[in-house]
Amino acid sequence: MKETKFELYELKPFIIDAVHRLGFYEPTDIQKRLIPAVLKKESVIGQSQTGTGKTHAYLLPLLNKIDPAKDVVQVVITAPTRELANQIYQEALKITQGEEGSQIRSKCFIGGTDKQKSIDKLKIQPHLVVGTPGRIADLIKEQALSVHKAESLVIDEADLMLDMGFLADVDYIGSRMPEDLQMLVFSATIPEKLKPFLKKYMENPKYAHVEPKQVTAAKIEHILIPSKHRDKDKLLFDIMSHLNPYLGIVFANTKNTADHIAQYLTGKGMKIGLLHGGLTPRERKKVMKQINDLEFTYIIATDLAARGIDIKGVSHVINYELPDDLDFYVHRVGRTARAGSSGQAMTIYELTDEDALVRLEKMGIEFEYLELEKGEWKKGDDRQRRKKRKKTPNEADEIAHRLVKKPKKVKPGYKKKMSYEMEKIKKKQRRNQSKKRK
């Protein structure tokens, strides 16, 4: 068996076996910086984008330090969405295969499932708990789940926890754990409103900020399509009808807009998946199954509903509108061009979007321009073409400039007088040109 660079961390044999099975050879940047700190039981803040290997940066060392001989909860991992919680749980199960690893009991508790069944599962306490904050907090309140001896708490996607209003539940969970708690916080951004919470639980945490090499994947084509005061719904339908995606996601900023788009497209005969925060757990589960079964070519989604969900095979992302928070643009387009594949991110833009587009360009995003004319894709005009266009002076302009000189001593209104004199000369030049042609 080929040795990997993970052997340097003195991890248990079952962890090293898992690393080989998963095909890992060299730790990612965030793993190099955080695995040693987590093994030393230090609290950490990891700021990184999706796809940097952050999940294994905490799973590998935390599973390594669990003692299966102790029948108590030792690690609690919280995630803002059911889908993300389940993904983390599945990764944990992959690591704990084999004779030694299988002694670690892991359980996943998420909202939208039967609470009594969850309570029944807790007659024997697991070593590792993964779940959504609301459900974990409920189980602690019911005295079904005991976390008072758990040494480590993970808060994944902390900025999304804040956005979705889950911080109070996380605070409750943390308050029921030991005072010398090891807290591991992972977030794409660290908003100001999150800082008081971090200060409450963390003293001199190790901080690792992994800057993405590129804001978005190299193989994403960023395409701008002007609305030009056209009916936006019809334009969207036309765009979707002239693409051939494996799977496409249309992003809207609000639940109401997503509902409106879905209703319009359904009326046009399209079979559409819909993902937003207004769905019941049962509806959401059904849509996710339909997506995984490839029943849809397109999904309409809002930002918060789509965060934390791993949807495979997305070839196209369409922004019905630009997000208010431009970080979400990066999250949206990051749905496509994964694992080295290519993808297209199309944005319908208005004239009022100019400021946002300039800011995205300053982040390093280069846009192409396309137009859909009579059912055919054509290269569009650069929205900056008017600003970039240089005025070419004609002969009359040049003569007028030469003949009308700026006075040495200027008086109020001189520009107007100069302009008037130049216009007189230009008219005379045009009359002379006209006579010559006759």
UniProtKB/Swiss-Prot annotation:
**Would you indicate the residue range of the signal peptide?**
none
Fill in the subunit field for this protein.
Interacts with CspB when cells are transcriptionally active. May interact with RNA helicases CshA and DbpA (DeaD), may be a component of a possible RNA degradosome complex composed of rny, rnja, rnjb, pnp, pfkA and eno (although rnjA and rnjB's presence is unclear). Specifically interacts with pnp and rny.
Reported phenotype of the disruption mutant = No difference in growth at 37 or 15 degrees Celsius, decreased growth at 16 degrees Celsius. The presence of CshA or CshB is essential for viability; in a cshA disruption mutant further depletion of cshB stops growth after 1 cell duplication. Others show a quadruple disruption of all RNA helicases (cshA, cshB, deaD, yfmL) was not lethal at 37 degrees Celsius, although both 50S and 70S ribosomes are decreased, but growth stops at 16 degrees. A double cshB-cspB disruption mutant cannot be made. A double cshB-cspD mutant grows slowly at 15 degrees Celsius. Decreased amounts of 70S ribosomes.
Q: List the GO molecular function terms.
A: ATP binding; ATP hydrolysis activity; RNA binding; RNA helicase activity; RNA strand annealing activity
Indicate, by first and last residue, each region the UniProt record lists as having compositional bias (Basic residues). Answer: 402-417, 425-438
Q: Motif DEAD box in this chain: where?
A: 156-159
Q: What is its EC number?
A: 3.6.4.13
Q: Where in the cell is it found?
A: Cytoplasm, Nucleoid
Q: Which CDD domains match?
A: DEADc (cd00268), SF2_C_DEAD (cd18787)
Residues that bind ATP: 48-55
Q: What is the species of this protein?
A: Bacillus subtilis (strain 168)
Q: Name one GO cellular component term.
A: cytosol
- The name this protein carries in UniProt is DEAD-box ATP-dependent RNA helicase CshB
Q: Where is this region: Disordered?
A: 380-438
- Swiss-Prot/TrEMBL catalytic activity: ATP + H2O = ADP + phosphate + H(+)
Compositional bias, Basic and acidic residues, is annotated for 392-401
Q: What does this protein do?
A: DEAD-box RNA helicase that plays a role in 70S ribosome assembly. May work in conjunction with the cold shock proteins to ensure proper initiation of transcription at low and optimal temperatures.
Q: What class of enzyme is it?
A: hydrolase
Helicase C-terminal domain: residues covered? 235-385
Gene label: cshB
Q: Locate the Helicase ATP-binding domain: which residues?
A: 35-208
